[in-house]
Amino acid sequence: MALSTSRAINHIMKPLSAAVCATRRLSSDSTATITVETSLPFTSHNIDPPSRSVETSPKELMTFFKDMTEMRRMEIAADSLYKAKLIRGFCHLYDGQEAVAVGMEAAITKKDCIITAYRDHCIFLGRGGTLVEAFAELMGRRDGCSRGKGGSMHFYKKESGFYGGHGIVGAQVPLGIGLAFAQKYKKEDYVTFAMYGDGAANQGQLFEALNMAALWDLPAILVCENNHYGMGTAEWRAAKSPAYYKRGDYVPGLRVDGMDVFAVKQACTFAKQHALKNGPIILEMDTYRYHGHSMSDPGSTYRTRDEISGVRQERDPVERIRSLILAHNIATEAELKDIEKENRKVVDEAIAKAKESPMPDPSELFTNVYVKGFGVEAYGADRKELRATLP
């Protein structure tokens, strides 16, 4: 498997700029330029790859660390809430994949659109959603981002260009192509990131949507988050050709180390520039989820604990940023631990506030069901009692 080969490589990013290797604390100048090299080269299909050299700053490094550790703490807390039966139904966690959400967000604006599948909590947070909105939604409360009606799989923040959160495998991709069509129709200089997993990569509708995007040169970026397992099925057992970045054939693609936030940032910056001028491109993010597929999956029956711990030790996205911050004397280990401690506190406070939010009124069952204006009648289970006329 390709993942085991990549594990043998030392993936820690290498600092290139001698000027910033001085022992002085760079935090005194948060805008100082630091040049880093991506952990691995980009592998490309029908396109010249971007440079491996990426510019950053102490401020951005610290922001990445804070954002990724906050996302991870949120997902760990969600795990505990689910086990305490405060979250019901489906719940898919994102810990391990944080570099994709954070790196992508660093390359785009809130006018660009993102649409994804059901592993959506961290994408929502990256788009500007709050922890209170996230936890309230997970617990089915009125103050949730979908008013407590969507749950884990249906987070939205339309005003920031986040269109969900979708529970049907692969069905979000055609919707994403529709968003890109609207952007081109309105002559906007923005793009849409349509995200899906390796488990959805064989869905027929994905190829149909990609063909349409290519035919009309739509500003669409298809992001395959390849965490190597579709539920419990390894990629090589489900796909004859698991090189998902080549799947478009006539559409260019890049394979990206999705555990390296700077590789993701560089690839997304490159992809946006390409899509605005030339149409769609595929980004395959080589990433890894630490939890099982969902809360009912222990995640250890189809992969070994050694495999999981090996990825944690050698490729963890948070530890990469921590190493880079320490190498450039931007912060001390104690200061980074203080940030993590503060994140823990912020998450705990958000959970407490979300618990105070009331449950939705039962009348909410009859809202947002049909397009307004049809006056559809809704009956009870016995079909005798008229419960409501839907607006």
UniProtKB/Swiss-Prot annotation:
GO terms for cellular component: mitochondrial matrix. Its cofactor is thiamine diphosphate; Mg(2+). The keyword Cell inner membrane does not apply. Residues 294-313 are annotated as: Disordered. One of its GO terms (biological process) is pyruvate decarboxylation to acetyl-CoA. It is an enzyme of class 1 (oxidoreductase). GO terms for molecular function: metal ion binding; pyruvate dehydrogenase (acetyl-transferring) activity. Its EC number is 1.2.4.1. It is found in: Mitochondrion matrix. InterPro entries: DH_E1, PDH_E1_Alpha_Subunit, Pyrv_DH_E1_asu_subgrp-y, THDP-binding. Tetramer of 2 alpha and 2 beta subunits. The pyruvate dehydrogenase complex catalyzes the overall conversion of pyruvate to acetyl-CoA and CO(2). It contains multiple copies of three enzymatic components: pyruvate dehydrogenase (E1), dihydrolipoamide acetyltransferase (E2) and lipoamide dehydrogenase (E3). This is Pyruvate dehydrogenase E1 component subunit alpha, mitochondrial. It comes from Solanum tuberosum (Potato).
